[in-house]
A protein has these predicted regions:
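Active-site-adjacent bridging/hinge elements
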Residues: 45-53, 163-171, 240-244
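Nuclease catalytic cores
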Residues: 38-58, 62-83, 116, 120, ...
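Short beta-strand or tight-loop elements
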Residues: 34, 135-141, 152-156, 262
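Metal-dependent nuclease catalytic regions and adjoining charged, substrate-binding loops involved
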Residues: 13, 32, 196-298
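Hydrophobic (often cysteine-bearing) scaffold residues that line and stabilize catalytic clefts
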Residues: 65, 69, 111, 115, ...
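A non-catalytic, helix-rich entry segment at domain boundaries
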Residues: 75-140, 146
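C-terminal, charged and often intrinsically disordered regions of DNA end-processing helicases
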Residues: 1-66, 287-298
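Mg2+/Mn2+-dependent nuclease catalytic core
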Residues: 141-237
Length: 298
């Protein structure tokens, strides 16, 4: 844990943990990173090297339909909130989805149209429950916070203000698996976003939510001061490893710190064509397989 422990009896006290101690002495340059970068390192050092260090990066495989689906929904919802309140209708959300639709990764036009129709239902149902007159504090907002070791940053899907004045981090999800409150509480990214949003907005922020559009469910958690401190400590722990690997790469060791970490997820890796271990560990998947699985799962 960095700095001094923040008081736990006030709202948002945990954010102070992330920034206290920053001026206590910084013998090294702060390491800039995002939760995505840290989690990529944790998942697979080889993929991390391909994603962030090796230039030019190895060629990727074809685009994934499930990634296009997520991008389409996120972009449509962001565009919906950019409208004036009178224009924010569920039907306009469906129209925006059609306008923002990303076609890449689907088997053919018929499959893309079928998935778009399914996603249109998600968006319509979701926006039926959103007050069009409520203005979020941020949409696709970049937030950042320095700690004793890092500069953490990331882009948040939505930052809401509740009627009691509290601030909530909202993350949209479009995958097949429904999410639980434990998923929201355990998410490193959401915890980091809460700390960073508090610093960026100068307001307490301890609540995080995962909005799962396929099921219309919300997984929520309210972090304690200690919980937010643990998220910062977790980020710093992962970053120490990633930074050491970065330095080794810069010094010429491009292999030792970056072993492949084969798993079933290798089927879905962008860099599968460049990784023999990944190809051996998991079967080939067509770019549209995940959206077929989503339909089969209901």
């Amino acid at each position: 844990m960095t700095g001094r422990r923040a008081p736990a009896d006030g709202p948002g006290g945990g954010q102070q943990v992330a920034v206290q101690g920053v001026l206590d002495g910084m013998p090294r340059r702060l390491y800039p990173c995002t939760p995505t970068r840290l989690l990529t390192w944790l998942d697979c050092p080889r993929r991390y090297r391909f994603s962030y260090l090796e230039r030019p990066a190895p060629p990727k495989g074809p685009p994934w339909a499930h990634s296009s689906l997520g991008t389409s929904v996120h972009t449509a919802l962001a565009a919906w909130f950019a409208l004036g309140p009178r224009r924010r209708t569920p039907q306009r959300g469906v129209e925006l989805l059609r306008e923002k639709w990303v076609r890449e990764g689907y088997r053919d036009d018929a499959q893309a149209a079928e998935v778009r129709g399914r996603a249109a239902g998600w968006v319509r149902d979701y926006l039926e429950d959103v007050d069009p007159h409520t203005e979020p504090l941020g949409i696709e907002r970049t937030v950042s916070v320095p700690t004793a070791q890092l500069v953490l940053s990331g882009r948040v899907d939505r930052i809401d203000e509740r009627r009691d004045g509290s601030v909530v981090i909202v993350d949209y999800k479009t995958g097949r698996r429904p999410l639980s409150d434990d998923d929201a509480r355990g998410s490193l990214a959401l915890g980091v976003y809460a700390v960073a949003a508090a610093r960026t907005l100068r307001r307490p922020c301890a609540a995080v939510e995962l909005h799962h559009l396929p099921t219309g469910t919300v997984a929520a958690a309210a972090h304690s001061a200690d919980g937010l401190a643990r998220k910062v400590a977790e980020a710093e722990s992962i970053a120490r490893e990633a930074r050491a690997a970065d330095e080794a790469y810069a010094a010429g060791d491009t292999e030792t710190p970056f072993p492949a970490r084969p798993s079933s997820m290798c089927s879905w890796c962008d860099f599968r064509p460049a990784c023999p271990q990944g190809r051996a560990a998991a079967p080939h998947r067509d770019p549209w397989d995940a959206v077929l699985a989503e339909r089969a799962g209901g």
